[in-house]
């Protein structure tokens, strides 16, 4: 959520930021509705004061049958009617303003490049060595040949975009989760938590998922939503909270299953594990002061990059343009891993700086150490990494001509010293 006071003072800057996103200007509408709202509040307060004075004067009239007493009573009645009318109008204006503000995206950072789609994103750097693999197979082909990726059985019970991992690939998934969290906690001082995967609507609103993206998540019949990312519960840990500046920054890491309806993704990545309704993800989250937030954003991104470096997976860092950046994001880096079979880079992590956007919605604040002033915090989060896509990257980049897959060196201790994943000779199902 944006600051209405800032919008009043900077209408042109708001429209400029919206224009970069390809959104029509709304500052005039916001300021007009806000002005009418404030006028209504002023009129209501004036009438309430007048009513109070008249009510006080009644107390000094001892003859309740007098004309003065009756006139004042009639005046108070008319004032009450007028206040009711104005309050109804005020509620209407507040609703209109809230609808606009709730659907207003965050301001894009000054260094975010202009662009209309992902083709205009800016590649900042490429890291790692792309191996020359002759006739590379797709991850789903490799997994099928290993006998360890089962889409058919998953589809029977859950429908499309679900998968069952078996044997060494299930073990690899578990190894990756532990490896990622160990790196983030021991090398980057993130504090591990295990949050809920079901949340109420207000928690989704606080991070910017609602109301705009209501159809992107799964909703239960009892008022809960399955989280699309651990960003939701991690951010809401600090909702309606005022922290002390000396306790900041706070860095959290969590592994959770994530659930997405993938509305609008029909026909996209229909084969394999790239786009699933359920997937595991290690999430990084930081809450910091505005002065620290840019540094913490780079720090969090470095933590996510470190996983790719340790696994020796080729990747690149991309700065998203204004037309591709998320609704709540102020600035976003995507980490894209190389997939040999697709002969291209694909997103494996998205790291975003949200400035005070989420904190304003969730009322997450801090008290300055010296001045004792209370201000809104800044939030930052990113994948560290998406586990399923990391499995995809390992299968494709570490595939061998004989159908086996080499286990990255950093994961071998987590796999009981195992160096290779070889095809199953028999399976339980």
UniProtKB/Swiss-Prot annotation:
GO terms for molecular function: ATP binding; serine-tRNA ligase activity. Disulfide bonds: none annotated. Pathway: Aminoacyl-tRNA biosynthesis; selenocysteinyl-tRNA(Sec) biosynthesis; L-seryl-tRNA(Sec) from L-serine and tRNA(Sec): step 1/1. Its EC number is 6.1.1.11. It is found in: Cytoplasm. It comes from the Bacteria. GO terms for cellular component: cytoplasm. SUPFAM superfamilies: Class II aaRS and biotin synthetases, tRNA-binding arm. Keywords: Aminoacyl-tRNA synthetase, ATP-binding, Cytoplasm, Ligase, Nucleotide-binding, Protein biosynthesis. GO terms for biological process: selenocysteine biosynthetic process; seryl-tRNA aminoacylation. It catalyses: tRNA(Ser) + L-serine + ATP = L-seryl-tRNA(Ser) + AMP + diphosphate + H(+); tRNA(Sec) + L-serine + ATP = L-seryl-tRNA(Sec) + AMP + diphosphate + H(+). L-serine binds at residues 229-231, 283, 383. ATP binds at residues 260-262, 347-350. Its main location: cytoplasm. Homodimer. The tRNA molecule binds across the dimer. Belongs to the class-II aminoacyl-tRNA synthetase family. Type-1 seryl-tRNA synthetase subfamily. Catalyzes the attachment of serine to tRNA(Ser). Is also able to aminoacylate tRNA(Sec) with serine, to form the misacylated tRNA L-seryl-tRNA(Sec), which will be further converted into selenocysteinyl-tRNA(Sec). Consists of two distinct domains, a catalytic core and a N-terminal extension that is involved in tRNA binding. This is Serine--tRNA ligase. The lineage of its organism: Bacteria, Pseudomonadati, Pseudomonadota, Alphaproteobacteria, Rickettsiales.
